[in-house]
Design a protein with these regions (language model features):
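ABC ATP-binding cassette signature C-motif
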Residues: 1-194
Length: 194
C-alpha cells in the first residue's frame, strides 16, 4: 500500500522505480499508467500525455499471429521495413514468421518492447522490462530507449539497465515514495551515506 504519495514526472524524464519485492512498485507503475485508480487522492496527467504500459507478462500478444504480422498491423510498413525493425530487436528471419505461441518469454518481451516503440505514446512505463532478456536483448532495448524522445518510467531490479536509462530514481519503500536525482549508482551512494 502506498500512502500520501506525491510524485511529479516531467516530459522527457527517465525515471527508474526501485524498492524491495512487495513494496508497491508495480502498483505505482499501474497508477502512473492510469491502469489502476487510486483509492484516495488523484492521478493527474497533462491532456497531451499518451501512455503505454509494458507489463511483466506479454499476455496481450495474439498467440496465433507472427511477429511480422503483428508489427505490420501495429503500423502500416513495407515488409522490408518491418523485417529491419524485427532484426534490430534481434529476431532472425525464421523467428519472424513463427506464431507468437512458439516464442520464449524473452522473445515475447522483445516483441512487446518493439511494439511500444511503434505506438503514438509519449510516455512509456516499463514493468521489469529486462526480465527474460539476455544481454544483447537488453542492449537492444537500451539503444531503442536512447532514441526515444518521450518520457520513460521503468520498474527494474537491473542496476546496470537503470544506470544506463534513468536520470532519476524513485524508491518505493514502507508505503512511501522518495525521489533521487541520478541513476542507480547515485541512488545507491546517496542511500548508504558519505
Amino acid at each position: 500500500m502506498l500512502i500520501d504519495v506525491e510524485l511529479t514526472i516531467m516530459r522527457g524524464e527517465r525515471v527508474g522505480i526501485v524498492g524491495p519485492n512487495g513494496a508497491g512498485k508495480t502498483v505505482l507503475a499501474r497508477l502512473l499508467a492510469g491502469d489502476l485508480a487510486p483509492t484516495e487522492g488523484e492521478r493527474w496527467a497533462g491532456p497531451s500525455i499518451r501512455v503505454d504500459l509494458l507489463t511483466q507478462t506479454a499476455e496481450e500478444l495474439p498467440l496465433e499471429r507472427t511477429p511480422i504480422e503483428i508489427v505490420r498491423n501495429a503500423r502500416p510498413l513495407p515488409e522490408s521495413a518491418a523485417v529491419a525493425l524485427l532484426v534490430r530487436f534481434l529476431f532472425d528471419v525464421e523467428q519472424i514468421r513463427r506464431p507468437v505461441a512458439t516464442m520464449s518469454g524473452g522473445e515475447r518481451t522483445r516483441l512487446r518492447c518493439l511494439l511500444l516503440m511503434l505506438t503514438e505514446a509519449n510516455c512509456l512505463i516499463l514493468d521489469e522490462p529486462t526480465n527474460h532478456l539476455d544481454i544483447p536483448a537488453v542492449e537492444a532495448l537500451e539503444a531503442a530507449l536512447e532514441g526515444y524522445d518521450g518520457t520513460v518510467i521503468a520498474v527494474s531490479h537491473d542496476r546496470y539497465f537503470l544506470d544506463r536509462i534513468a536520470d532519476r530514481i524513485v524508491d518505493v519503500r514502507d508505503g512511501d515514495v522518495t525521489a533521487y536525482e541520478g541513476g542507480f549508482s547515485a541512488w545507491e551512494r546517496g542511500r548508504s551515506g558519505p
